[in-house]
């Protein structure tokens, strides 16, 4: 298929940006012709061109399908008559993530989002989870038998200070990696140096794919602290239903979440995380779902 991937920006590291890269890589790998559309080029679009041979285009041609992530790109590409547009919605609150009336169909990355999109569009919205490249994000160094090093991918400095103090009480070191301040492309190397990772959303999934237990908590700019605690077999479905964004439990008790994470830590939990990622978050499986949906919808429309 001739496929156009669209993202508002491909300039810096971000959730939808790395998602777009992973999807592009898998589509190219499986024989599809892929191009990208964005309003702001940069690090990600450059990597897509260099690593994958995926060029950034003004979308003057016609595509079999457009897989777009933001309402801005949907509107622009509908005006260009670029092709059948499927918008993937990644968030509930951000204006860019709201379902656009200019899309032909919608996909949501979680059950929570699916319900949100359906309430607006009155159209049944399938769920396709965030896809992770499990060949790239994989266990290289095994997690330690004892929890000694935690990597925080949280954005909020004040939260990281509090987390560091709490982990220090257990003799555990906390290291920080904020993609806004010190972006690192090959974050999987940093993840593999830690025993546990703190993150939300896609960062949590990447850590799981690397075989690391994950503590879901962060405070994003202009938003309240949100946490779901440590990901466990007994709560994973509830957390995944909200894209592991801290919305399932909305826990604000950091001391309690850290204590529970420390008590439940085990390298075996990391092994379970890896297996879950392979079975449910693998970009190969998610891409297959997109292609099947594309064929179904395009056949129905035409």
For each feature predicted by the language model, list its residue ranges.
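Acidic donor-binding loop of glycosyltransferase active sites
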Residues: 189-205, 212-213
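A short, glycine/small-residue-rich beta-strand->loop->alpha-helix junction that serves as a flexible
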Residues: 7-19, 158
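Active-site proximal beta-strand in glycosyltransferases
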Residues: 63-70, 79-94, 104-108, 217
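Catalytic binding pocket for nucleotide-activated donors in carbohydrate/polymer assembly enzymes
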Residues: 203-263
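A charged, aromatic-enriched C-terminal amphipathic alpha-helix characteristic of glycosyltransferases
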Residues: 15, 244-301
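Acidic anion/phosphate-binding donor-loop and adjacent secondary structure
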Residues: 96-99, 115-120, 131-146, 185
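A short, active-site helix/loop in glycosyltransferases that binds the activated sugar's phosphate group
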Residues: 97, 103-124, 161-162
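Conserved donor-binding/catalytic core segment of Leloir-type glycosyltransferases
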Residues: 107, 127-133, 141-164
């Amino acid at each position: 298929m001739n496929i156009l991937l669209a993202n508002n920006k491909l300039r810096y590291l971000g959730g939808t940006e790395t998602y777009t890269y992973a999807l592009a890589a898998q589509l190219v790998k499986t024989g599809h012709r892929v191009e990208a559309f964005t309003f702001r080029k940069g690090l990600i679009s450059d990597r897509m061109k260099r690593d994958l041979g995926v060029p950034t285009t003004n979308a003057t041609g016609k595509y079999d399908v457009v897989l777009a992530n933001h309402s801005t790109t949907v509107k622009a590409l509908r005006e260009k008559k670029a092709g059948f547009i499927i918008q993937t919605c990644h968030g509930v609150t951000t204006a860019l993530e709201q379902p656009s009336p200019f899309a032909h169909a919608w996909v949501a990355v979680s059950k929570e989002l699916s319900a949100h999109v359906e309430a607006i569009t009155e159209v049944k919205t399938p769920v396709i989870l965030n896809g992770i490249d499990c060949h790239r994000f994989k266990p290289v160094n095994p997690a330690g038998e004892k929890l000694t090093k935690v990597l925080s991918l949280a954005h909020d400095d004040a939260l990281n200070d509090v987390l560091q103090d709490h982990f220090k009480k257990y003799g555990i070191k906390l290291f920080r990696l904020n993609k806004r301040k010190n972006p690192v492309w090959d974050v999987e190397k940093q993840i593999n140096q830690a025993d546990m990772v703190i993150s939300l959303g896609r960062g949590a999934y990447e850590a799981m794919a690397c075989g690391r237990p994950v503590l879901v908590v962060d405070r994003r700019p202009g938003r309240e602290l949100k946490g779901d605690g440590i990901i466990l077999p007994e709560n994973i479905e509830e957390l995944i239903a909200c894209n592991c964004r801290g919305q399932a439990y909305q826990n604000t008790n950091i001391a309690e979440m850290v204590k529970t994470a420390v008590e439940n830590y085990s390298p075996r939990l990391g092994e379970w995380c890896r297996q879950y990622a392979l079975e449910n978050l693998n970009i190969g499986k998610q891409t297959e779902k997109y292609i099947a949906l594309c064929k179904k919808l395009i056949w129905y429309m035409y």
